Amino acid sequence: TIAHGCSFTRYGWPCWPKFVPWFNGNIRMINKGRSGSGNETISRAAINSAMKHDMIEHMYIMWSGTDRYEVITKDRIADEREGRATYYVWDDDCQWSTWYGGHPEKDKHEYYRRHFWNEEHQYYRTLEHIHRTQLFLDKKRIPYTMMIFNNYVLRDNYYSESEQELYNNIDWTKFLFYKGRKGLWEFAEDNYKEYYIPGESHPPPIAHYHWVKDIMFQSEVLCKEDEYNK
């Protein structure tokens, strides 16, 4: 079993992939989430996993913000992250480094956002990434479940007929949502806000556990009390 997503999938404490084995017969989970991932990055990583790994029992994908983009370089030197929100990771499979969180130089990031980034385009591309990933996983006959990290990943008003048709070609039965078209962010804020660390926007582990239990598996089974109280 493999998980892909952003920091709502892999962070500095246990996230939802940690708890999936508690409900699926303890099948081994490989968490390939990366903080700052955009949907192009997530799609590429999911497709690469499908090509790289044999006998994938299930793939779980949590889509990220439409505003994010990636920067590719061939740098292999050590990444000095101190004082910077962005970071890069060398990918042996693709033979390049991916910058997560946007361009590392603020002026270039702002220039890109001002002159090249377009909101309508980003929403359209997100649907493309979802659709492409579904087509590939279907071809490989890999079972999969898709989710969103918050309700801004998708929208109800479409900019064009093409965007509407692309939306209609996505298999939405493969998605799990909270309260209509909401994601983990809203689920955690609505139900587990008292557990948040002050100043932290990422859901605490208890919210991730209940996301798996209540949303993903809709299970009545409770974990051991000592685990729950950690």
Label the model's feature ranges.
Residues T1-K52, P203, A207-H210:
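Serine-esterase "nucleophile elbow" of acetyl-processing enzymes
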